């Protein structure tokens, strides 16, 4: 009984096709949007608490939100970005602030 086997060699097309189909997961930016009611110190607190920024970096991002209308807080995989948006939104509502946090594809 003889069986025919097709051997995969390093230069075969099959191996190359398998490798080219693998892609890294998409990344998403978590963005804070400016409003006229949320205090600046609360925005800094959010950036330190949920995004682990130090005071200087949090202040820079807060000022960018204030003057440019929005700023990126961090870039994450989809699941982590969704979690960050939900955490910030819930924390803002608990403290009665209308801070808007969104995510967009990087």
UniProtKB/Swiss-Prot annotation:
Q: Which Pfam families match?
A: ClpS
Q: Which NCBIfam families match?
A: PRK00033.1-3, PRK00033.1-5
Question: Oligomeric state and partners?
Answer: Binds to the N-terminal domain of the chaperone ClpA.
Q: Which GO terms describe its biological process?
A: protein catabolic process; proteolysis
* Functional note: Involved in the modulation of the specificity of the ClpAP-mediated ATP-dependent protein degradation.
What's the protein called, per UniProt? ATP-dependent Clp protease adapter protein ClpS
Gene3D superfamilies xrefs: 3.30.1390.10
Organism the protein comes from? Vibrio vulnificus (strain YJ016)
Q: Which family does it belong to?
A: Belongs to the ClpS family.
Going by the entry's taxonomy, the superkingdom of the source organism is recorded as: Bacteria
């Amino acid at each position: 009984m003889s069986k025919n086997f097709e051997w995969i060699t390093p230069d075969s097309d099959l191996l190359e096709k398998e490798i080219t189909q693998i892609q890294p997961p998409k990344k998403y930016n978590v963005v804070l949007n400016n409003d006229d009611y949320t205090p600046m110190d609360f925005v800094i607190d959010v950036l330190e608490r949920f995004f682990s920024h130090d005071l200087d970096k949090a202040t820079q991002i807060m000022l960018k939100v204030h003057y440019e209308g929005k700023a990126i807080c961090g870039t994450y995989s989809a699941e982590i970005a969704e979690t960050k948006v939900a955490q910030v939104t819930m924390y803002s509502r608990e403290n009665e602030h209308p801070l808007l946090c969104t995510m967009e594809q990087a």
